[in-house]
Curated annotation (Swiss-Prot):
Disulfide bonds: 83-107, 324-332
Family under the similarity heading: Belongs to the polysaccharide lyase 1 family.
Record key words, sorted: Carbohydrate metabolism, Cell wall biogenesis/degradation, Disulfide bond, Glycoprotein, Lyase, Polysaccharide degradation, Secreted, Signal
Role noted for this protein: Pectinolytic enzymes consist of four classes of enzymes: pectin lyase, polygalacturonase, pectin methylesterase and rhamnogalacturonase. Among pectinolytic enzymes, pectin lyase is the most important in depolymerization of pectin, since it cleaves internal glycosidic bonds of highly methylated pectins.
Region of interest (Disordered), residue spans: 383-428
Superkingdom field: Eukaryota
Protein name: Probable pectin lyase F
EC annotation from Swiss-Prot or TrEMBL: 4.2.2.10
SMART domains for this protein: Amb_all (SM00656)
Record field: catalytic activity: Eliminative cleavage of (1->4)-alpha-D-galacturonan methyl ester to give oligosaccharides with 4-deoxy-6-O-methyl-alpha-D-galact-4-enuronosyl groups at their non-reducing ends
Residues annotated as glycosylated: 276
Organism of this sequence: Aspergillus oryzae (strain ATCC 42149 / RIB 40) (Yellow koji mold)
Compositional bias ranges of the Low complexity kind: 389-417
A cellular component annotation (GO) from this entry: extracellular region
Length: 428
């Protein structure tokens, strides 16, 4: 009998897992028809450099994330660099100071300070068209760097990946997933935690045909802009012409911008579960058109920000559920609120101007939402079929280099370049 070395056996199993990996489910909502890397052979990159190369190249790919890819320290650090103390930080080390980004006056007259941060987190990895990025089980983690989809890219699937630890101590520390001028993007079964800025953001250029589904936005943090252990910068939609389906997601321990939506956009938010939000969830600004149905809000202080709602919002209650039939081909589902504030918005103009490209959207009644979402949203749950724990079994804790001075320091020129490059592309 031939005995195989355990390491060789493990490597063989991982290789087989990568080859067998494929997308689970079918894109729906505005992202219907997205195919990503299609029939390209699934392959797992060997290291962070190869991952970056594969994401950015012009070839259709199915990129398998079968382990943790840790980018912290890969682009050096900025030590004792310019930062500021915003008015929101009234709690010292438990709050968030802000990185002073060149080309932006965000820090303005705030008191200056210095801080040390990781350069890799400032700018996401660029993702080219026709890509599928898919994690294996709960092992697929991208630490210290996000994903950036810009400049007309299209046909991309991101599924079953955990993005975490992008300079969570600092405002402007990095965005997990950013879109700016895209089409046909499906973000599914993703988890985001411990970021400095946005968990999911669309920039000023239109991102049409986007669905964010079955994902977990975990706002628990030691560095909170609201000084309460909840992350403020959560989901932001700024694209002119965005069309986004936001369904079956778990948004918890946030304190604002969950989401903030502006400009000429259409968002359909249904069957999401908001839990333990100490501030506001929806913040609907000028030009936005938002349909909110079949969601559950539990212990959410302010489901709709009343101070900034010049946009058009239709938040469905039991009395007007039938109004949706002409727009969606079915009645809407009323929202449910428990130990929460008021969810306002009754503008039926949202329905009369609803885009035709969303296709069929099947919504469940709110009594099923909390258990379904907590069992299915996030990583490691592609085959859960409605069962499982509320969060990933991957234990995410900040690595030592993120809160202490790292072993290597960037030269002044490389740090300045990183800050300038970030500021040119991030004004939201």
């Amino acid at each position: 009998m031939v005995l195989l070395h355990p390491l060789l056996t493990a490597a063989a199993l991982l290789g087989a897992s990568a080859r067998a990996q494929s997308v689970v489910g079918t894109p729906f909502g505005f992202a219907s028809g997205t195919t990503g890397g299609g029939n390209a052979a699934p392959a797992a990159p060997k290291d962070t450099n190869e991952l970056k190369e594969w994401l950015a190249d012009p070839n259709p790919r199915v990129i398998v994330i079968d382990k943790e890819f840790n980018f912290i320290g890969t682009e050096d650090t900025c030590t004792d660099c310019e930062c500021c103390i915003p008015d929101s930080n009234t709690c010292g080390d438990a709050g968030q100071n802000a990185i002073k980004t060149e080309g932006s006056d965000w820090c303005g007259s705030y008191p200056a300070t210095t801080c040390t941060y990781d350069n890799a987190g400032l700018e996401g990895m660029e993702v080219a068209s026709d890509k599928t990025i898919i994690g294996v089980g709960d092992a697929g983690v991208i630490r210290g760097k996000g994903l950036r989809l810009v400049n007309g890219v299209s046909n991309i699937i991101i599924q079953n990946v955990h993005i975490t630890e992008l300079n969570p101590q600092y405002i402007w520390g990095g965005d997990a997933i950013s879109l700016d001028g895209t089409d046909k993007i499906w973000v599914d079964h993703v988890k985001v935690s411990l970021v400095g800025r946005q968990m999911f953001v669309t920039g000023y250029e239109s991102s049409g045909g986007v669905t964010v589904s079955n994902s977990e936005f975990d706002g628990q943090t030691k560095w909170s802009a609201s000084c309460d252990g909840h992350h403020y910068w959560s989901v932001l939609g700024y694209g002119k012409g965005d069309q986004i389906t936001f369904a079956n997601n778990y948004i918890h321990h946030t304190s604002g911008r969950s989401p903030k939506i502006e400009f000429d956009s259409h968002w359909h938010a249904y069957n999401n579960f908001w839990e333990n939000n100490s501030g506001h969830a929806f913040d609907v600004g000028e030009g936005a058109n938002v349909l909110i149905e079949g969601n559950v809000f539990s212990n959410v202080k302010t489901p709709m920000n009343p101070e900034d709602t010049p946009g058009s919002t239709f938040a469905v209650n039991a009395q007007d559920a039938s109004s949706c039939t002409s727009a969606l081909g079915r009645p809407c589902i009323a929202n449910e609120l428990t130990s929460s504030g008021e969810l306002s918005g009754n503008d039926e103009a949202v329905l009369s101007g609803w885009p035709k490209g969303e296709g069929d959207t099947k919504a469940m009644t709110t009594d099923k939402v909390p258990s379904y979402v907590k069992a299915n949203a996030g990583v490691g749950k592609l085959g859960s079929g409605g069962s499982g724990a509320a969060s990933s079994s991957v234990s995410i804790t900040p690595s030592p280099t993120s809160s202490a001075i790292p072993s290597s320091s960037a030269t002044p020129s490389s740090s300045a370049y990183a800050r300038r490059h970030y500021a040119r592309h991030h004004h939201y």
